[in-house]
């Protein structure tokens, strides 16, 4: 990924050799939220902008001291029953509430985990891509497989620093079970993209009717794939010249999700034209963060769905993947201004056309990480049509792909699920959840 600097109209003053001179402000160009620094999103004009109005940043633990989270955590209300006493004496604070679908009495916490730079963790291999970013934490030695196939990491504490991120990948969902306090100032991301499967993102076969179906083939113009469903329904795939678009993935019954740890469903592939149809976007993964003490979030915890691929010549665009699951539970939950907990759907891919030199449709955007706005569908090539937007914010359903005389656009993926649970909760007005979610008691 390369960032380009572009000059903006604003002017700031710089002091050079004792003299005050004017210099242009700069902003980073972007194609999506992942291209921007923390606490910024990809805004109008494809430039990185602040996600929320600036607010005082909470104190951050000092790097290089894993295991000191209880002392460095800037939580408030230590005299209000925060079960963090005794950490210095080798005791693990017990949970004063029952975390969802977790038998915490069977888990023994290991050392604290500190994420100090950008890396990823694979629930299949149980390894960090860059072990140095995890400050020497041996996840493979402490990981536990739960009865539902979830990989759990029992921890004494957790810190994700503001200039660090942890991408969560692999076939199995992940549960971070913290017997103590946790601070997330950087990013925890279980989302999917065209290159990465988020941890626990299910296969088409696992999703059943909640997966988008494939568009019909037609060398004169194929149908787009349907968007994946999860908390809501995906978008319809757009029709091609004489080919129907794929059906959207259905919303899952929320009653069946009360304790399950599972991700969002994939979009259907676009039908084949003269060229191939676009691939369906993967659904977001499943992340469960349970903290016995105080959890303070000023960064990002997310599980967006992946965007659908653009169709080849006269091929249909792929449907976007649905957002996944972000379940956060704590004794005391604090969401600071600038915090973002998101599970947005991916945009559908654009349809292809064989009349233009650039015959491929564009890929749909992945679900937004730090905003409640819809991921854009990919543009269609030439006379072909674009994909539908992903579900986000108060619009949880994916938008339908457009019909076309060439390749139809893929439907957008639905939004996923955010769960916030706390014995006590502090949610700042500048904190964001998408889809919108309120904190509830256990």
Segment roles from a protein language model:
Residues 143-146, 163-172, 436:
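Beta-strand repeat architectures
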Residues 20-106:
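Ser/Thr-rich, Pro/Gly/Ala-heavy low-complexity intrinsically disordered linkers and tails
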Residues 163-165, 186-188, 299, 339-340, ...:
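Small-residue (G/S/T/A) turn/hinge positions that recur once per unit in extracellular repeat modules
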Residues 94-152, 172-175, 181-417:
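Glycine-centric low-complexity/flexibility signal
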Residues 22, 32, 37-38, 44, ...:
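Disulfide-rich extracellular modules and peptides
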Residues 77-79, 86-91, 429-442:
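Enriched but not universal
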Residues 1-18:
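Sec-dependent bacterial lipoprotein signal peptides
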């Amino acid at each position: 990924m390369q960032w380009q600097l572009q000059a903006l109209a604003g002017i700031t003053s710089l002091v050079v050799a004792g003299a005050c001179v004017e210099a242009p402000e700069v902003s980073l160009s972007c194609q999506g939220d992942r291209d921007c620094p923390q606490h910024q999103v990809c805004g109008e004009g494809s430039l990185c902008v602040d996600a929320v109005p600036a607010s005082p940043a909470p104190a951050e633990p000092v790097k290089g001291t894993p295991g000191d989270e209880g002392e460095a955590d800037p939580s408030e209300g230590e005299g209000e029953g925060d079960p963090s006493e005794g950490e210095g004496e080798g005791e693990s604070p017990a949970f004063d509430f029952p975390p969802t679908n977790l038998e915490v009495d069977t888990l023994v916490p290991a050392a604290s985990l500190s994420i100090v730079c950008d890396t990823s963790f694979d629930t299949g291999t149980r390894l960090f891509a860059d072990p140095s970013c995890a400050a020497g934490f041996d996840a493979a030695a402490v990981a536990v497989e739960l009865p539902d196939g979830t990989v759990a990491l029992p921890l004494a504490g957790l810190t994700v620093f503001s200039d660090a991120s942890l991408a969560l990948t692999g076939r199995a969902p992940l549960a971070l079970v913290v017997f103590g306090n946790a601070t997330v100032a950087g990013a925890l991301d279980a989302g999917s993209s065209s290159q990465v499967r988020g941890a626990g993102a299910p296969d088409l076969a696992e999703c059943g009717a909640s997966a988008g179906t494939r568009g019909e083939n037609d060398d004169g113009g194929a149908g787009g794939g349907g968007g994946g469903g999860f908390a809501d329904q995906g978008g319809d795939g757009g029709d091609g010249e004489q080919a129907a678009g794929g059906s959207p993935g259905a919303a899952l019954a929320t009653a069946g999700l009360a304790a399950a740890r599972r991700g969002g469903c994939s979009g259907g592939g676009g039908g084949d034209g003269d060229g191939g149809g676009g691939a369906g976007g993967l659904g977001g993964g499943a992340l469960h963060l349970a903290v016995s003490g105080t959890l303070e979030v000023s960064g990002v915890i997310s599980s967006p769905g992946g965007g659908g691929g653009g169709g080849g010549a006269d091929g249909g665009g792929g449907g976007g993947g649905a957002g996944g699951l972000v379940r956060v539970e704590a004794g005391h939950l604090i969401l600071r201004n600038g915090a973002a907990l998101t599970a947005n759907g991916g945009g559908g891919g654009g349809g292809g056309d064989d009349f233009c030199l650039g015959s491929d449709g564009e890929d749909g955007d992945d679900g937004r990480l730090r905003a409640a706005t819809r991921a854009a569908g990919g543009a269609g090539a030439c006379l072909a049509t674009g994909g539908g937007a992903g579900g986000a914010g108060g619009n949880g359903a994916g938008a339908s792909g457009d019909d076309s005389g060439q390749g139809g656009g893929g439907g957008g993926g639905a939004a996923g699920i955010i769960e916030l649970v706390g014995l006590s909760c502090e949610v700042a007005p500048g904190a964001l959840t998408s889809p919108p979610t309120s904190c509830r008691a256990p």
